[in-house]
């Protein structure tokens, strides 16, 4: 392991596919900072096709509890962040162990480039008559 601290940013949908790796991180006493973006589902898929499609939703786990689940005697610190003040508190915590930060986000909060990429991909795959053109399906950048 390099001497520098690792930062991991992962969405809740992706994390649910690989959550057990937190156990490996704890077993080897690695000390990354994990930012879990909890937006209730697969944001990239919502941008691509299906803003309101339920298949893009994932179950809401108690993510911040998982380090204790995988290793009950862990010294890892977990935080659920909903405000800037919460984030400041999490980032000010001693960093001598794994830090797990669950950041709650709006399900449709996406960078403009991601939204545009999703819209373009849907147009390429499905054309102008595709279901992505229904008004309730398309994500649009905030104005």
What residue spans do the PLM features occupy?
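Thiamine diphosphate
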Residues: 1-143
């Amino acid at each position: 392991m390099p001497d520098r601290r690792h930062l991991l940013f992962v969405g809740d949908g992706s994390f649910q596919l690989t959550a057990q790796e937190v156990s490996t991180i704890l077993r080897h006493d690695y000390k990354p900072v994990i930012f879990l973006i909890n937006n209730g589902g697969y944001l990239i898929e919502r941008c691509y096709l299906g803003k309101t499609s339920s298949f893009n939703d994932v179950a809401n786990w108690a993510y911040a509890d998982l380090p204790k689940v995988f290793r009950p005697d862990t010294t890892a610190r977990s935080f659920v962040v909903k405000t800037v003040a919460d984030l400041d508190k999490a980032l000010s915590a001693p960093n001598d162990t794994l830090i797990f930060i669950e950041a709650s986000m709006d399900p449709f909060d996406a960078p403009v480039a991601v939204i545009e990429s999703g819209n373009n991909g849907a147009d390429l795959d499905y054309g102008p008559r595709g279901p992505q053109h229904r008004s309730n399906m398309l994500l649009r950048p905030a104005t």
